[in-house]
Amino acid sequence: MVKKRFHFSLQTKIMGLIAALLVFVIGVLTITLAVQHTQGERRQAEQLAVQTARTISYMPPVKELIERKDGHAAQTQEVIEQMKEQTGAFAIYVLNEKGDIRSASGKSGLKKLERSREILFGGSHVSETKADGRRVIRGSAPIIKEQKGYSQVIGSVSVDFLQTETEQSIKKHLRNLSVIAVLVLLLGFIGAAVLAKSIRKDTLGLEPHEIAALYRERNAMLFAIREGIIATNREGVVTMMNVSAAEMLKLPEPVIHLPIDDVMPGAGLMSVLEKGEMLPNQEVSVNDQVFIINTKVMNQGGQAYGIVVSFREKTELKKLIDTLTEVRKYSEDLRAQTHEFSNKLYAILGLLELGEYDEAIDLIKEEYAIQNEQHDLLFHNIHSQQVQAILLGKISKASEKKVKLVIDENSSLAPLPAHIGLSHLITIIGNLIDNAFEAVAEQSVKEVLFFITDMGHDIVIEVSDTGPGVPPEKIEAVFERGYSSKGMRRGYGLANVKDSVRELGGWIELANQKTGGAVFTVFIPKEKQRGNPFDSHRDCGG
């Protein structure tokens, strides 16, 4: 049988704990005060009984009553009654040395009382006993006669106080104390409820196990996210950093309790926190690194209590974007190749249906000769499959655009080194050839020449065209991102070429031919370079 487990909310637990503590503390305090008051009342009653007995024992009429059997009985009785009325005593007795009652208040039927040994030796005594069937506190004091050189105990005085009167006083005090305790408990319960509600509000209504689950999920997500994540408090001190952020910032491990401006100097994140403004996709430089950052200001009650910063390296994002762009271009080139062959197949099919067999054969031979010439040169001289695939796509695209793409017969290329990836080749070769296609689009002679060789220490790629060339004053500008004379959203191809060449440790030269047209020459070292000692591009002149 499965035992049913009871789950109590945080609010219930807090109220229960505080209530239990209040009950315990107030209960202990009430009992302590009650015991102290009870003991105090009893001591007060005992002291009053003894003090009254002593006072009466010193009175001359009382002493004379004991010394003389017939003396001052009426006067002594009057004194006793007065003392009884003044002190509120239940009964007062005057005894001789044998314990016989010589005088008593009221109409007591007692004839004799037992005396303690303390009385016989001149001491006072307090006891609890019964008188007329009622519980009393009895205080006794000796009656002492001074003789020459000594004192003699000739009798004693006993004063009784009812215990019920003391108990009533104690009960009254306990009732008052109980009322106060109940009021304090009630206020404590109300305070506990308010505190529990406030704590629940601070925890956004979440229970401890839910907070723990969210904490574990947060840590798992922060570990899985490849973006750098940093959070701060309202003072701009780092309270959280994931592993990716530490790696990007070249820190040995995630750090906290440091100002955000010390962790990411130059990013201006403290001003973001002070102004309470978000920064979407901002490019910032931190320690010679360029990041794309996004900031989110955390607000509560209209006040900022911290920021969350997410960031990635710009180069990583750029590589991803450029790769996607170039893969799309590569896909378009393959589509152009498919489209071109489809057109030629339909042309051959049409000639066959019309019975023009000789013309169909001539078209096939012509296409075969063109493809054979290009393919022989491509596959015999160039042994890099990546470059072969790119050029095949561009050949088909050139045919579709009615542009003559010529691969220089002196081209030669062995398999490329491992550090030169397909994305680099697509970016460099693809953009240079596409740029040449656009340059000759409005020319009467539409020809693009491609040359590649790996002789020497560098891989040399050269693309020339029969276009109008590049004005000398714009040679520097053509490699800037966004520069284009062809409209919006253009001017990124040559900038991407420059970036890819720099990543490979190479450089690019741009010149104008004497006969017209531009020549782009790229030099890429065969061995991977640690840095780039060359300029991003060089103008060789016309």
Curated annotation (Swiss-Prot):
Q: Can you tell me which residues the record assigns to a coiled coil?
A: none
- Which residue ranges are assigned to the Cytoplasmic compartment in the record's topology? 1-13, 197-542
Tagged with keyword Transferase: yes
Q: Which UniProt keywords apply?
A: ATP-binding, Cell membrane, Kinase, Membrane, Nucleotide-binding, Phosphoprotein, Transferase, Transmembrane, Transmembrane helix, Two-component regulatory system
GO cellular component terms, A-Z:
plasma membrane
What residue stretch is flagged as signal peptide? none
Residue ranges spanning the membrane: these are: 14-34, 176-196
What SMART domains does the entry give?
HATPase_c (SM00387)
Keyword Cell membrane appears in the UniProt entry:
yes
Stored Pfam families: HATPase_c (PF02518), sCache_3_2 (PF17203), SPOB_a (PF14689)
- EC number(s)? 2.7.13.3
Q: How does it sit in the membrane?
A: Multi-pass membrane protein
Intervals, Extracellular compartment: 35-175
The UniProt function text for this chain reads:
Member of the two-component regulatory system CitT/CitS. Regulates the expression of the citM-yflN operon. Functions probably as a membrane-associated protein kinase that phosphorylates CitT in response to environmental citrate or Mg(2+)-citrate complex.
Q: What is this protein called?
A: Sensor protein CitS
Native organism: Bacillus subtilis (strain 168)
User: Taxonomy-wise, where does this protein's organism fall, top ranks first?
Assistant: Bacteria, Bacillati, Bacillota, Bacilli, Bacillales
Q: Which gene encodes it?
A: citS
